[in-house]
Amino acid sequence: MKPQQPQPPLLLLLLLPLLLTTVSSYPLNPKQLKALQSLNISTPTNDPCNNNNNQSSSSSITCDDASPYRHITSISFTNCSSTLSLPSKTLKPLSKSLISLSFTNCPSLSPPYHLPISLHSFSAVSSFLQNNRTKLSGLFLARLKNLKTLYISSTPIQTSRRLYVILGNMHKLTSLTISNSNLTGLIPKSFHSNLRYIDLSNNSLKGSIRISITRLKNLKSLNLSHNSLSGQIPNKIKSLTFLKNLSLASNKLSGTIPNSLSSISELTHLDLSMNQLNGTVPSFFSEMKNLKHLNLADNSFHGVLPFNESFIKNLNFFEIGRNSELCYNKTVLSSNLKLEGLAPCDKYGFPLWSPSQKEESLSGENDYDVEGGNEEKTENLKTKEEEEEEHKGSNKTLFGLGIGLFSLVFLILFLFYLAKRCRLI
């Protein structure tokens, strides 16, 4: 009997690894290889496209699978040498294929001003820091009109132009991060509708939260924290129905939390801490089933905290402290919860502790730990009004005693006088 011949599909499967090896063995474009060699980029083999797993390398390179030559599509520089430079003659051979370029911890490097405008992704973290000549230019960024991702962090942007001028031509941009980059001015009056992620935190932006942001129907994350934004949270924020993360912390926002915020049912992370927000804490938060992170600390909220124990326990993070006029109902919330910087309410719904008493009574303890001996201390604490009433009462008592003693002395003297007159008669 003749041995059975392998079926064609099985034969193809057996040959597939060989075919893949053949494809990946195509050499790098000679001009691009020469450009890399001029940058002194060390590679473990003759193929720079295979250095991604080399931890000792200061660069990471990605290539396509084109034939007869492969092309570089992505370069990431990390911990750059002070001697590294990117002259235009080096970048020019890369311009036709390079779509992603990133720099991390390259402080002495000058920005690559001759970058190809075909880039889809540009990232700079703690780079271009040495002097004004090497700082990143807003005008340079504005040229990159094909970007889909722009990530700038801890890298100053030198520009007298407004943020909109930088972003104006980036119609394809979906992810925008410019954080800790010395941005000033106002939030742009308009954004391109493709944006899904915005992080403009740790800058010096001022003015109000513009309505332009609420028109970004596909926005999933918005971080405007650590700026100098003022005014109120706009009611139209309810339009951001796909928003999952919202951070407006460390600004100068005032007014109340708008009820329209309850319309963002997908919200999982909300940080409004360190502002000047006032009014009562909305009860609708407890109905937002996806909410896992809630920070309302360091504001001017007042009244009774409207949350129950099950809602707070369902959160991964909850901070509400340092709202001096806000308190919790200890008959609703268990003492097992740890609420830092929040006083219990008295029977009238006001904080039981004054701020000075809070500091004394909370030294080394949690604000919510009021069981046992702590509960007895809590009951013995008096508000300023109670102390004033006691002080007034003691003054009245002393005054009454004084009048009584004076009357007694007068009566004795009067009787003595009458007795003396009777003897004379």
Swiss-Prot record:
Question: Which Gene Ontology terms of cellular component type are present?
Answer: plasma membrane
Q: Cytoplasmic side: which ranges?
A: 419-425
Compositionally biased spans, kind Basic and acidic residues? 374-389
Pfam families, alphabetically? LRR_1, LRR_8
Instruction: Report the transmembrane regions from the record.
Output: 398-418
InterPro entries per UniProt: Leu-rich_rpt, LRR_dom_sf, RLP_Defense
Q: Name one GO biological process term.
A: regulation of defense response
How is it placed in the membrane, per its record?
A: Single-pass type I membrane protein
Q: Which residues are glycosylated?
A: 40, 54, 79, 132, 182, 202, 223, 245, 278, 308, 329, 395
- LRR repeats: from-to residues: 144-169, 170-193, 195-216, 217-240, 242-264, 265-287, 288-313
Query: Which range is the signal sequence, renumbered to this chain?
Result: 1-25
Region annotated Disordered, chain positions: 355-389
Cysteine pairings via disulfide bonds: none
Regions of this protein lying in the Extracellular compartment: 26-397
Provide this UniProt record's keywords sorted from A to Z.
Cell membrane, Glycoprotein, Leucine-rich repeat, Membrane, Plant defense, Receptor, Repeat, Signal, Transmembrane, Transmembrane helix
Localisation per UniProt entry: Cell membrane
**Family statement drawn from the similarity comment of this UniProt entry:** Belongs to the RLP family.
Q: What does this protein do?
A: Involved in plant defense.
Q: Under what name is this protein listed?
A: Receptor-like protein 55
Q: What is the organism of origin for this protein? A: Arabidopsis thaliana (Mouse-ear cress)
Question: Could you read off the lineage of the organism from its UniProt record?
Answer: Eukaryota, Viridiplantae, Streptophyta, Embryophyta, Tracheophyta
